C-alpha cells in the first residue's frame, strides 16, 4: 500500500494504470469483466496541468458501455473547476 491505513487486500485487488494512455484504456476494455470500478483523479494533484479531456471522456464511454462504476476523486478539485466539479467540466 502507498499510504498508512490502506489495507493490503485493497492494493492486491487494484490495477494501477498510467494516466492518460491508450494502454490504460485497452486494459479497462480487455479486463472489464474483472473491474468493479475505475477510480480516477480528473485533475491530478501531482500534475495539475495534465488534463486529458478526451481520455476521461473515453473512460466514461467504456465504463458506461461495460457497466463499470466510474468514480472521480475530486478531493483536490471539488467545486473549484466548476459548480458540478471537474466531472461537469470534462
Regions found by a protein language model. Give the residues of each.
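Catalytic PLP-binding core of fold-type I/II PLP enzymes
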Residues: 49-83
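Short acidic, glycine-rich surface-loop motifs adjacent to enzyme active sites
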Residues: 32-49
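Active-site flanking residues adjacent to catalytic metal/cofactor-binding acidic residues
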Residues: 17, 40, 72-73
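Conserved active-site segment immediately N-terminal to the catalytic lysine
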Residues: 87-90
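Surface-exposed, flexible loop/turn segments at secondary-structure boundaries
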Residues: 22, 46, 83
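Metal-dependent enolase-superfamily TIM-barrel catalytic cores that perform enediolate-based chemistry
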Residues: 20, 29, 37-40, 56-66
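Short, glycine/acidic-enriched loop or turn micro-motifs at the edges of active sites
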Residues: 21, 44, 76-77
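PLP-dependent aspartate aminotransferase-fold enzymes
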Residues: 1-37
